[in-house]
Amino acid sequence: MKIRKPKKEKVFYLIGAASQTGQVREKDLLVMKPNFWAISGNGYAQFSQNYISDNWYKGGESTVSLLSGAVLQFNYDDKQKVQLENKIEWKLGFISAPSDTVHQYKTSEDLLRLSSKFGYKAITNWYYTISAEFKTQFFSNYETNSDKMVSSWLSPSELNIGIGMDYKYVKDAICNLSVLINPFNYTRYSVASDKVDPTKFNIDAGKKSKDQLGSRVEATLKWIIINNLTWESRFSYTTN
């Protein structure tokens, strides 16, 4: 009697996959590779107009303002040890300035902030962390009724790099708390434009930058109160 070698089957159901005749059926198995990256973001835009009559005894002036902002996040979490958080944030606001005869509009909000934080889990809720943050502004800002520049793109700019620990508390995707403690923090202030006075930004006269070593504490809270209503706050304190 000739014995036939069995064919190599791809995948078999071991439990509950047999037919009524007792034969095992062949089945392909689709394995999904986990995606540890999460991309999210939100934005807003607000427009307001304020009219004050000439007869109003307290005085004042009518204004038109526009405020906008956005936050983009690119985060990595392997659900075991490693976390990487990257964030891009900007705020832009403009307001009309009737009393300013030189400039028709002025900036009321102007911020660009880039941040990154790498964490390796130490114990429950605590991570060894290396963090970096850079912030500056987009547009030039001037004194009222003057062409004297107060601030501009990269003037000033601030860079923070720190090493420390990060405490994280997350509850049911409703509350997200992070407290970053950097005992070792490096800060660099710089002014790129020759038209901006560096002494207004903690930089010595005649210089373009200033380096400082110190510590830094930063706490961020995101709390979803109800659907479509979220509370976000941020606290930062740096020593030198």
PLM region spans:
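Outer-membrane beta-barrel channels and translocator barrels
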Residues: 34, 75-79, 119-125, 170-174, ...
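N-terminal periplasmic/intermembrane-space "pro-region" immediately following the signal or transit peptide
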Residues: 1-35
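Transmembrane beta-strands of outer-membrane beta-barrel proteins
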Residues: 39-45, 84-88, 128-132, 159-161, ...
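Residues on the lipid-exposed face of transmembrane beta-strands in outer-membrane beta-barrel proteins
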Residues: 41, 45, 68-76, 114-120, ...
